Amino acid sequence: MGLIKKVTHWSYDNLIDYLSVNPTRDEVTHYKVDPENESDESIIKLHTVKDFGSITCLDYSESEIGMIGVGEKNGYLRIFNISGQNSSSPASHAPVGLNANNETSMTNASGGKAAQAENIVGSVSNLKDTQGYPVSETNYDIRVRAKKQRCINSLGINTNGLIAMGLDRNKHDSSLQIWDMNYHDDSHETINPMFSYCTNESIVSLKFLNDTSVLAASTKFLKEIDVRSPNPIYQHPTRLTYDIKLNPFNDWQFSTYGDDGTLAIWDRRKLSDQASLGDLNVASPLLTFEKLVGSGAASRKYMNSCFRWSCVRNNEFATLHRGDTIKRWRLGYYCDSNRDIAADDDNEMNIENLFVSSVHDTNTMYDRVATFDYIPRSNNGTSLICMRQSGTIYRMPISEVCSKAILNNRNSLLLSNFENTEIDEIRVNNEHEKSNLENVKTILKNLSFEDLDVSEDYFPSGHDEPNNEIEYSELSEEENEGSNDVLDSKRGFELFWKPEKLLEKDISVIMRTRASLGYGLDPMNTVEMIDSSKNLQNNAYIRNTWRWIAIAKASVDDGTMVSGDLDLGYEGVIGIWNGINGISNQDRYRQETILSDKQLNKEMEKIIKLRRKNRDRNSPIANAAGSPKYVQRRLCLIISGWDLSRSDYEDKYNIIMKNGHYEKAAAWAVFFGDIPKAVEILGSAKKERLRLIATAIAGYLAYKDLPGNNAWRQQCRKMSSELDDPYLRVIFAFIADNDWWDILYEPAISLRERLGVALRFLNDTDLTTFLDRTSSTVIENGELEGLILTGITPNGIDLLQSYVNKTSDVQSAALISIFGSPRYFRDQRVDEWIQTYRDMLKSWELFSMRARFDVLRSKLSRTKTGVLTADIKPRQIYIQCQNCKQNINTPRTSSPSSAVSTSAGNYKNGEAYRRNNADYKKFNTGSSEAQAADEKPRHKYCCPHCGSSFPRCAICLMPLGTSNLPFVINGTQSRDPMQTEDSQDGANRELVSRKLKLNEWFSFCLSCNHGMHAGHAEEWFDRHNVCPTPGCTCQCNK
């Protein structure tokens, strides 16, 4: 088995030294590697020493550059300088200094690579000389053996010249022999050991820990030996003793393996602690990996296992498997809770508790890899140098996986590789269009549930549904024609799966873009925004949901869903259908009111009459007039938008046919029970196919009263399962069996359409079953359009929870839920969504949108009696009176606490004294006229507590806060002289009105305390720098 070993402390340039032993174990090669060059050209072969017997071990000196030791199976140890100009052949057997004329076995790269190798050798030697590093230019070659010649299993060289040999067992000679090369007699090939240990044992592995300590392992024991002591510091019985390797980042830890390939990681502190207690059975490895390096690993002991500690990252090692896979293991650790970590040194942290945090597999570039080692690169990067079983050396880069991946609040992805100080960023740079909410026209004046859209998300057969997902503008027309080929090609993969594209279409980016456009602050504006914005995930169900909310809000605002003590705002179909049970868990009526089913029906009838006022139409459910739930059914039809008259039918048909959707118009005619109208609609279509279908449907008029089965019914059933258009399918399904459930079971038909059919034609029992079953389905699936069924109620919150779990669209959930909570009910999930969305708006720095959201929430929480149910945070800034130091926005109070807080000067004023002194009010009860005068509202330009006038404006001398000023304060806002009030639209006029109102607000200088109207301050400091108050030299604008 071959060997590659990284050499430390030899190179003082930017190159790294490596020593290798070929798989046949008969030659040693010295390489230099450029760590920053990933090509195989970076591997430069400098020297190769051949003609060894069977190499069993190899080590090098960290202090003597070029000095290596090679142990052989025949018991000889050869020590020579591999970096010298000439490396001797082992056949000479000559001492140091006598082999200058011997033949050198050196293999250099041919051509330019050979010249490069020669330059490197010379440059490195000169560089070391100039920097003062000792370099031995003497070529030496020493061959020695133990007194009892036997196989050398392991070898170690420390920085002081001590050489340790681990030998096979011998009854009369020690197996661990340590000798000093500095005092060796070159005329003898037998060594004279200075220290000897482990008689009648076979040492299979050893490693110098420092100048005096060595870690040795026999086939049965692990031992730490201090050469200054005749006895080991400890010896631990174990069979996991082969190939000791120290952790380069923590020399307390080392690894070994056993004959069956089981790998163990040890901590010397743990072994020494147990030895000091006299208990050898308690000590155990920190981690054990069963058969990790393969069974029969001990038979490969003459080199080393396919195990390497990482020299780049702490707590990482790599293993080779099957010659084609390298696994990189990363360890984590946790400390004992009863130990004070701060008291430990950095190198002595309590890491006895290790665990595997992650494992990453890397496939080798070529198969039949025999061994490998790490190549450290700058910035904590790494690659691998590998040797195949043929002896070929090649370099393999490693694609670093991300140890940290964090998305920021703008959905840019930050990536960090391991402990790399550099951070990669995938930034989302797409700039979406901006929108001004004031420019979106609303049509809420006459909006009602009957105005729900008829288009929805239907696309007739033969037409492609527009894709609201990722738009691929890079595709040309030719590429569109061959889209299948593009998808299968590499270019197509890169095109459709760019990280930037994926991040742009992530829900967090979509939510941020929606928020910047004012999404959800006004339902009808939201519908218009969805229609005009092409870059968002504007699914039809989102649009239809917001349109229903807009109509429900208009009904709440104009009071058409309120009757007496009953408020059915934003209530869904199933809540109304279930009556008292449907609204019992909500605050729909006053708490002191006991509402019965009979009273509820009366209130619902009042709501129906109020909504049907000035509407002359017949009831669409005359066949259910005798039902005990007739009132609920009629109100459910209103809520769902299906309370239509005959004239409304015709308008709906014309709108749908104008859009070219004749199939849908015919299906709506069937939903209204008008089969002849459906035939007429399809017969008027331009497509011959639809006219033929109209002929087939016309057979219903002839066969509807015939009992039994016939060929026409069979053909209709067949077409109902074979046609692609869902509306044609339900038409044929219904006329074949005259069963409305065929329409209700069709999932391709929208929920609102199926709901309209059920409310019109099902009896009470079947309708209850349908509503319960459908509501359970939409809640479980998180179908947002199902809010028309559940309403914004506790059941609706369950639906929104499923929707959030499916889409992560917490924005829509928060904005929708505030229409019902906390006005009608409270739910902790709503509070969590609201807080999450507020935090998101703050992280996106959309503070104005967050303020609008808070204002909208407080408005929607106000009940019909004017009570705010939301927990509104109090204002943090207010204006206080300079006289009494109280908030001028709070109403005056007659409590004793207010009297205490009022300044002493106010008590001299008789009016203030009478108002605030409780004793005076107690005894002076006869002064009714004074009390009546005291209860009169004060002017807006004086303090409501003490009656002091507000400061006057330094420009106009009018008291600040005065309403209905006799002049207009324009401020410094520029206005187009050609633009008149008539030419401005409603939104601009409202904006100008708000600006003029803002110009009348208070404005104070914090230095001189002089005040002005905000608009007057703008006008004054647009031309001046000094305060307008006479005698004041304050520069207020600075």
Swiss-Prot record:
It holds the Pfam family zinc_ribbon_16. The keyword Nucleotide-binding does not apply. Disulfide bonds: none annotated. InterPro entries: MIOS/Sea4, MIOS_a-sol, WD40/YVTN_repeat-like_dom_sf, WD40_repeat_dom_sf, Zn_ribbon_mio. Its main location: cytoplasm. One of its GO terms (cellular component) is vacuolar membrane. One of its GO terms (biological process) is protein transport. It is a peripheral membrane protein. The modification Phosphoserine is found at S123, S136. It is found in: Cytoplasm; Vacuole membrane. Keywords: Cytoplasm, Membrane, Phosphoprotein, Protein transport, Repeat, Transport, Vacuole, WD repeat. WD repeats lie at residues 50-90, 147-189, 235-276, 544-587. Belongs to the WD repeat mio family. Present with 184 molecules/cell in log phase SD medium. Component of the SEA complex which coats the vacuolar membrane and is involved in intracellular trafficking, autophagy, response to nitrogen starvation, and amino acid biogenesis. Component of the SEA complex composed of at least IML1/SEA1, RTC1/SEA2, MTC5/SEA3, NPR2, NPR3, SEA4, SEC13 and SEH1. This is SEH-associated protein 4. It comes from Saccharomyces cerevisiae (strain ATCC 204508 / S288c) (Baker's yeast).
